[in-house]
C-alpha cells in the first residue's frame, strides 16, 4: 500500500500551511492557513487540487488544525463557509477557544480598514467554529471505522498539538509548529515512539542552531534598557498569544528588579486581558512551574504592564510597547512603526520569524542589526504600493521564536522513529541542506516537495522475529520441496552466472538454485584497515530481467559497502563479511515483467530496495567458528567445491571441514569461503533461541511471493528475521503461519 502527501501550502515556503495526506482510501487535510504576506487570492491554499467541481466534503474525510496561528487556521472559514466543506474538523480545546478571536481580529483589519470584499464575515467565523470537534491530548479519536487520530503536546503556543493519524496499519505524524525546548510558560514537545510510515515536520529553522537562551534574554533586556535610558521608545511586534507571554514575564520581572517602574510598558488594548483569561482556563497546558505557582500568584497578572491606548503613540518620553501583529503586516504594530521609525532614538525588536512579503521581513533582510551604530544610517522601506517611509530607528532581530531549531527537528525524528520524513514550512535551500543531513545521519528517506507536488510513499511492513536456527533450516528445505517438488540439497552449484542466462528460456522459472558466489563476484576492499591490504570477497544482488539479459550481470552499483551492510544488519562495526553461497527461487506468481527475476536466498539482506509485491525474510547467523590460515582456507575451498561436484560425499567432507575449523584455534582474520552444506551443518550445532514477534496481525498473512536475500557474516550475536508481507497466495500464508505456530 502507499501513502500520498501533497502540500497545498507551506511546500518549500512558510505560510498558508495546508497538507493533504491520503492513507488508504482516506484523505486528511492537516491545517488550513493563510499567507500573511499575500493580499490577493494567493493568500489561501489552492483548493482546486482537491476537487475541480467543489465536492470537498466527499473528498476530504476530516480537517485537523494544529494551533491557532493564522498561517495554520486562517483559511478555515473560507474553506468551510465559502468553499462548502461540511465534514468534521478537529483541534484542541484551547485552539478552538482562541481561533475565532484571532480570525475576527484579522477580518476587521482586512475588511473594515483595507476595504477588501472577497473575505469571510464575522458570522462565517462563528458558523465555522460550530463544526469543530475538540480533542484532548493522548485521546484516540475514531473519525470513522478505519481512521483514528491522536494529539500530542507540541509546545509552541497554548493548545498546539502534533497529530498521529492511522488507517489500518499505515500511519502519519503531522507536527504543525512545535518547540523541543521548554520556555518560561510552556513545556517542550513530546511524542511516543509511534514509528509512523511518514513524519511531516516543520522546518522554519532548518539550518539554525540557537545559542544560549539565557544569553538572548540578557541581550534583549540590555538593548531595551539602553534605549529607554536615552529617552527612546521600543516597539516589539508580537502575536497576541504565545511568544508575547514569554517576553512579558521576562520584562516584568526585570523592571521590578531594576526599579524601572517610572518607564511605562504597554500591551495592545484588550489582548492582555484575553490572554490572562485563556491561560487561567487552560492552565494544564502550561509548564510545571506555572501550574505550581498559579494557586498563590498568577504569573500573567503583570505589575508593570498596562493596556495601550492609541493616543499614547505620540506621548513624549521613553516607553516599551508590545503590539500586534508580529510580522508588521497590518494593525497596531504597523501603525506605531510608521510613527516611531523615523526617530533614531527609537528601536524595533523583532523577536520571531517574518514571512516574505511582510514589512517585518523587509526590515530583517535589509536593515536588521546592521544599524547598531550610535547614529544609525537611514533606509527607505516600502510599506505598501502607495507608502514608503524613511527608517532611522535601530532594527534588531532577537530570536525568541517558539519553533524547533535544527537540533530540535533531529531530536523529534529520533523520538518518533519514522520510516520516511517529509519537510514542510521552511525555505527551499535550508530544507535541502537538512534533508541531506537526515538521509546521511539517520538513514531515513527524506523529501521536501513544493506546493502541488505529490510524494508517494511505499508502506510495506516488516515483522522482526527471533527464530530457532535449526527450525529455519528445516523450513527452508520443506519450502523448497513443497514449492519445487525437489529437495534443496539435490541442486547443483552454478559456477558461472552465464549459466543463468542460458536457462532463461527453459522451464526453470520456478526452480530453486544454489549459486556459488565465490566464482561470480569481483573483489572489493571491505572493512579495510591501513595495515590490512588483503582483498575480501563482496556479496552482490544479481537480478535477471527481460530488459537486461547481457552477460555482464554484476555491476559496481550492485555492491553493498561494509558500513551500509553493518547498518542494515545492526551489527558491530568490527564485523567482517565473508564469502558464502546464495539460493535463488523464481516465483510463478510474479508479474510477467518480473518473471525472470533472480530471487536470492541466504544469510542476511543486502541493500537493495524490494518492490511492493514481495515479502522479505531477513536473518543473520551466529557461526562462532575459528578461521583457518590462508593455505587452509584454499584447501577448504577446494574441498567444498569438490563436495559440490559429488553430492554423495557432501555431508562427510563438510563435517570434516567443520571439525578442522573447530580444531584450528588461531587469530587469523582472513575470510573463509563456505558452501551451503557447511553453513547448514554449523547451524545444526546451534541451540534454538525462541521467538519474539514484535507485531503480527492476520491482515499481513496474504503474501504474493517470498524473497530472501543473503550475505554471509562472520560474527553476529543473534539471528533476526524480518518478513515483509503482501496480499495473495493463501497457501504460502498458511505455510508461514504454521512455521510461526510451531516455534516454542
UniProtKB/Swiss-Prot annotation:
Binding site residues for Zn(2+) 2: 71-72, 177, 425
Region span, Disordered: 626-669
Essential cofactor(s): Zn(2+)
GO CC field: cytoplasm; INTAC complex; integrator complex; nucleus
Intracellular or extracellular location(s): Nucleus; Cytoplasm
UniProt KW Hydrolase keyword: yes
Gene Ontology molecular function: RNA endonuclease activity
Nucleotide-binding is among the record's keywords: no
InterPro entries: Beta_Casp, INTS11-like_MBL-fold, MBL, Metallo-B-lactamas, RibonucZ/Hydroxyglut_hydro, RMMBL
EC nos: 3.1.27.-
Residue interval(s) of motif HXHXDH motif: 67-72
SMART domains membership: Beta-Casp, Lactamase_B
Keywords tagged on the record: Cytoplasm, Hydrolase, Metal-binding, Nucleus, Zinc
UniProt: Zn(2+) 1 binding residues: 67, 69, 156, 177
Self-association state and partner proteins as the record states: Component of the Integrator complex. The core complex associates with protein phosphatase 2A subunits, to form the Integrator-PP2A (INTAC) complex.
Functional summary from the UniProt entry: RNA endonuclease component of the integrator complex, a multiprotein complex that terminates RNA polymerase II (Pol II) transcription in the promoter-proximal region of genes.
Family statement drawn from the similarity comment of this UniProt entry: Belongs to the metallo-beta-lactamase superfamily. RNA-metabolizing metallo-beta-lactamase-like family. INTS11 subfamily.
Protein name: Integrator complex subunit 11 homolog
Provenance organism: Dictyostelium discoideum
Gene name of the record: ints11
Amino acid at each position: 500500500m502507499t501513502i500520498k502527501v501533497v502540500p497545498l501550502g507551506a511546500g518549500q515556503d512558510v505560510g498558508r500551511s495546508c497538507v493533504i495526506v491520503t492513507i488508504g482510501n482516506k484523505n486528511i487535510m492537516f491545517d488550513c492557513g493563510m499567507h500573511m504576506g499575500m493580499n490577493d487570492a494567493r493568500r489561501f491554499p489552492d483548493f482546486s487540487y482537491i476537487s475541480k467541481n467543489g465536492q470537498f466534503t466527499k473528498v476530504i474525510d476530516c480537517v485537523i488544525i494544529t494551533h491557532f496561528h493564522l498561517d495554520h487556521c486562517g483559511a478555515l472559514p473560507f474553506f468551510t463557509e465559502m468553499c462548502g466543506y461540511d465534514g468534521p474538523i478537529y483541534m484542541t480545546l484551547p485552539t478552538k477557544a482562541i481561533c475565532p478571536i484571532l480570525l475576527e481580529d484579522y477580518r476587521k483589519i482586512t475588511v473594515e480598514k483595507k476595504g477588501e470584499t472577497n473575505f469571510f464575515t464575522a458570522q462565517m467565523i462563528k458558523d465555522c467554529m460550530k463544526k469543530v470537534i475538540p480533542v484532548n491530548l493522548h485521546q484516540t479519536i475514531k473519525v470513522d471505522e478505519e481512521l483514528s487520530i491522536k494529539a500530542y503536546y507540541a509546545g509552541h503556543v497554548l493548545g498546539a498539538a502534533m497529530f498521529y493519524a492511522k488507517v489500518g496499519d499505515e500511519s502519519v505524524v503531522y507536527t504543525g509548529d512545535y518547540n523541543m525546548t521548554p520556555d518560561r510558560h510552556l513545556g517542550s514537545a513530546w511524542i511516543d515512539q509511534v514509528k509512523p510510515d511518514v513524519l511531516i515536520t516543520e522546518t522554519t529553522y532548518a539550518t539554525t542552531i540557537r545559542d544560549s537562551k539565557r544569553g538572548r534574554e540578557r541581550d534583549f533586556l540590555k538593548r531595551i534598557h539602553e534605549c529607554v535610558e536615552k529617552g527612546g521608545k521600543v516597539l516589539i511586534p508580537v502575536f497576541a498569544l504565545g511568544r508575547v507571554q514569554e517576553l512579558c514575564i521576562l520584562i516584568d520581572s526585570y523592571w521590578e528588579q531594576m526599579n524601572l517602574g517610572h518607564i511605562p510598558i504597554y500591551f495592545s488594548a484588550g489582548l492582555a486581558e484575553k490572554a490572562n483569561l485563556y491561560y487561567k482556563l487552560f492552565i494544564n497546558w502550561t509548564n510545571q512551574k506555572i501550574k505550581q505557582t498559579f494557586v498563590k500568584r498568577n504569573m500573567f497578572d503583570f505589575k508593570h504592564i498596562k493596556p495601550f491606548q492609541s493616543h499614547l503613540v505620540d506621548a513624549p518620553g521613553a516607553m516599551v510597547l508590545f503590539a500586534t501583529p508580529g510580522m508588521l503586516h497590518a494593525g497596531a504594530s504597523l501603525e506605531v512603526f510608521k510613527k516611531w521609525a523615523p526617530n533614531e532614538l527609537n528601536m524595533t525588536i523583532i523577536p520571531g520569524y517574518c514571512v516574505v512579503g511582510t514589512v517585518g521581513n523587509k526590515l530583517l533582510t535589509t536593515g536588521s542589526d546592521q544599524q547598531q551604530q550610535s547614529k544609525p544610517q537611514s533606509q527607505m522601506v516600502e510599506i505598501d504600493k502607495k507608502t514608503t517611509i524613511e527608517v532611522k530607528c535601530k532594527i534588531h532581530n532577537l530570536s525568541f521564536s517558539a519553533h524547533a531549531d535544527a537540533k530540535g527537528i533531529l531530536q523529534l525524528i529520533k523520538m518518533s522513529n519514522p520510516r520516511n520524513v517529509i519537510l514542510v514550512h521552511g525555505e527551499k535551500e535550508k530544507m535541502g541542506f537538512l534533508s541531506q543531513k537526515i538521509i546521511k545521519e539517520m538513514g531515513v528517506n527524506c523529501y521536501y516537495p513544493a506546493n502541488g507536488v505529490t510524494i508517494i510513499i511505499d508502506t510495506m511492513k516488516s515483522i522482526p522475529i527471533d527464530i530457532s536456527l535449526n527450525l529455519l533450516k528445516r523450513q527452508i528445505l520443506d519450502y523448497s520441496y513443497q514449492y519445487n517438488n525437489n529437495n534443496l540439497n539435490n541442486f547443483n552449484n552454478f559456477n558461472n552466472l552465464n549459466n543463468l542466462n542460458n536457462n532463461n528460456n527453459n522451464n526453470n522459472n520456478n526452480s530453486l538454485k544454489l549459486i556459488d558466489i565465490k566464482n561470480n563476484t569481483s573483489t572489493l576492499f571491505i572493512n579495510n584497515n591501513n595495515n590490512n591490504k588483503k582483498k575480501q570477497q563482496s556479496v552482490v544482488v544479481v537480478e535477471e530481467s527481460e530488459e537486461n539479459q547481457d552477460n555482464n550481470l554484476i555491476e559496481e552499483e550492485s555492491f553493498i559497502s561494509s558500513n551500509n551492510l553493518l547498518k542494515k544488519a545492526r551489527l558491530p562495526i568490527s564485523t567482517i563479511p565473508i564469502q558464502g553461497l546464495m539460493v535463488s527461487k523464481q516465483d510463478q506468481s510474479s508479474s510477467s515483467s518480473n518473471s525472470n527475476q533472480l530471487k536470492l536466498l541466504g544469510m542476511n539482506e543486502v541493500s537493495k530496495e524490494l518492490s511492493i509485491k514481495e515479502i522479505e525474510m531477513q536473518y543473520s547467523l551466529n557461526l562462532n567458528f575459528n578461521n583457518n590460515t590462508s593455505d587452509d582456507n584454499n584447501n577448504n575451498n577446494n574441498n567444498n567445491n569438490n563436495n559440490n561436484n559429488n553430492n554423495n560425499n557432501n555431508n562427510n567432507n563438510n563435517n570434516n571441514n567443520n571439525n578442522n575449523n573447530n580444531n584450528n584455534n588461531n587469530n587469523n582474520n582472513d575470510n573463509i569461503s563456505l558452501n551451503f552444506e557447511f553453513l547448514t551443518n554449523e547451524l545444526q550445532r546451534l541451540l534454538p533461541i525462541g521467538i519474539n514477534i514484535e507485531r503480527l496481525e492476520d491482515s499481513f498473512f496474504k503474501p504474493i511471493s517470498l524473497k530472501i536475500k543473503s550475505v554471509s557474516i562472520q560474527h553476529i550475536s543473534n539471528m533476526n528475521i524480518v518478513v515483509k508481507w503482501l496480499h495473495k497466495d493463501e497457501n504460502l500464508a498458511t505455510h508461514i503461519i504454521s512455521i510461526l505456530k510451531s516455534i516454542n
